[in-house]
Design a protein with these regions (language model features):
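Conserved RNase H-like, two-metal-ion catalytic cores of nucleic-acid enzymes
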Residues: 1-110
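Glycine-rich, acidic and aromatic/proline-enriched surface loops and short helix-turn segments
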Residues: 113-114
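Mixed-charge, glycine-rich, non-catalytic linkers/tails in nucleic-acid processing enzymes
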Residues: 82-83, 117-187
């Protein structure tokens, strides 16, 4: 199982450029692959996507995301059809429905007692706001890798809670199948 997160130039998955991909397959361990920053520290997008494709399309490896629908659409536009997906946002919704917000920063603070680096900390706001592609790779790495690690940690916690509270079938039977349906409806 691996947590996957894409960093992009826009919040619209249909109108965005892929800036980087972060991955985590162990709590406390994550990496960031920069591919679209305005920097010489980037790796070729074609090479990265070619290497990631077998991993992300392998049905025997679970891909975990926070609102993975966004990442699915972004990567699908680049020729990768992610299979075997779990979504921490949907898992949170099954566990707590209307109790809390289900964005990653809120979930991290509530369930992991950890305040993550905010997007605004990196890109600024208002007239001084920059595109993520202009963020220094070192700063982007800290932010993006943290996102993948938090997603992986939330997944482990939520999966256990769903099993303990006998709600895993609600997630597996009703919520999880919706991920792929919504993905293809939006493409």
């Amino acid at each position: 199982e691996v947590a996957v997160d894409t960093e992009t130039s826009s919040l619209d998955p249909h109108q965005t450029d892929l800036i980087g991909v972060s991955l985590s397959c162990k709590i406390g361990k994550a990496c960031y692959i920069p591919i679209g920053h305005n920097s010489k520290k980037c790796i070729s997008k074609d090479i990265v996507l070619k290497k990631l494709k077998p991993l992300l399309e392998d049905p025997s490896i679970k891909k975990i995301g926070q609102n993975i629908k966004f990442d699915f659409i972004v990567l699908f536009k680049h020729g990768i059809n992610i299979t075997s997906m779990d979504d921490t946002m949907l898992m949170s919704y099954v566990l707590d429905a209307g109790k809390n917000r289900h964005n990653m920063d809120s979930l991290s603070e509530i369930h992991l007692n950890h305040k993550p680096i905010t997007f605004k900390d990196l890109v600024g706001t208002g007239k001084k706001e920059i595109n993520f592609s202009s963020v220094e790779v070192e700063k982007a790495k800290d932010y993006a890798a943290e996102d993948a690690d938090i997603t992986f940690r939330l997944y482990k916690k939520f999966y256990k809670s769903l099993k303990d509270e006998k709600m895993i079938n609600i997630y597996e039977v009703f919520e999880k199948p919706i991920i792929k349906i919504l993905d293809f409806m939006e493409i």
